[in-house]
UniProtKB/Swiss-Prot annotation:
Protein name, as recorded: Lecithin retinol acyltransferase
GO MF annotation list: acyltransferase activity; O-palmitoyltransferase activity; phosphatidylcholine-retinol O-acyltransferase activity; retinoic acid binding; retinol binding
Keyword Endoplasmic reticulum: yes
Regions of this protein lying in the Cytoplasmic compartment: 1-194
Localization per Swiss-Prot or TrEMBL: Endoplasmic reticulum membrane; Rough endoplasmic reticulum; Endosome, Multivesicular body; Cytoplasm, Perinuclear region
Topology in membrane: Single-pass membrane protein
Organism superkingdom: Eukaryota
Disulphide bridges, residue numbers: none
Species this protein is from: Homo sapiens (Human)
Active site: 60, 72, 161
Length: 230
């Protein structure tokens, strides 16, 4: 049986991560034309390579399949609204992506290198060095990616593009980006100033709205749980 408290914490963490990276998604709209007009030299890419595209706050990952094709996980609201492949196979816009993150629907899809990178620089197999893990054979990596093509549930914390490529490349789905974000949240929670600030805000809400259950209980329990977590 799932722990309701853990589910609430998980949901809050995902929403915080989405908000903190909203500028990443929205800033991409200005670079869409640039990405489509960019040309990438793919002769040095090998089938099964991990392609890494650093962004402002997050890094996007994919598996190179050869012939200028990249398999990558993309949230997309259209997947929940239509089965029309002609519409869902078009390049995912930022609005589709953001709404897809919110409703947690995605697909592992194949796009051109240009559509995958959108004008950004591409790093190749950088994870091998940063994670210091032994990679599977490139052909095995590519085959794993191809087997996973299609619809998949999405989670910023537990099932994102980094989980996809690390599973294909190393056999284990991990996401250092998500882990780093969770650690940052833990540090904030453990900071006694956060407890004090939440207590002050809680008291202020009681003063402004009166002693009613929907303000009194959060004002008491939120500082208490933050204090206990610290």
């Amino acid at each position: 049986m799932k722990n309701p408290m853990l589910e609430v914490v998980s949901l809050l963490l995902e929403k915080l991560l989405l908000i903190s990276n909203f500028t990443l998604f929205s800033s991409g709209a200005a670079g869409e034309d640039k990405g489509r007009n960019s040309f990438y030299e793919t002769s040095s890419f090998h089938r099964g390579d991990v392609l890494e595209v650093p962004r402002t706050h997050l890094t996007h990952y994919g598996i190179y399949l050869g012939d200028n094709r990249v398999a990558h996980m993309m949230p997309d609201i259209l997947l929940a609204l239509t089965d029309d492949m002609g519409r869902t196979q078009k390049v995912v816009s930022n609005k589709r992506l953001i709404l897809g993150v919110i409703v947690k629907v995605a697909s592992i899809r194949v796009d051109t290198v240009e559509d995958f990178a959108y004008g950004a620089n591409i790093l190749v197999n950088h994870l091998d060095e940063s994670l210091q893990k032994k990679a599977l054979l490139n052909e095995e990596v590519a085959r794993r990616a191809e087997k996973l093509l299609g619809f998949t549930p999405y989670s910023l914390l537990w099932n994102n593009c980094e989980h996809f490529v690390t599973y294909c490349r190393y056999g284990t789905p991990i996401s250092p980006q998500s882990d780093k974000f969770c650690e940052t949240v833990k540090i904030i929670i453990r900071d006694q100033r956060s407890v004090l600030a939440s207590a002050v805000l809680g008291l202020a809400s009681i003063v402004c709205t009166g002693l009613v259950s929907y303000t009194t209980l959060p004002a008491i329990f939120i500082p208490f749980f933050l204090w206990m977590a610290g």
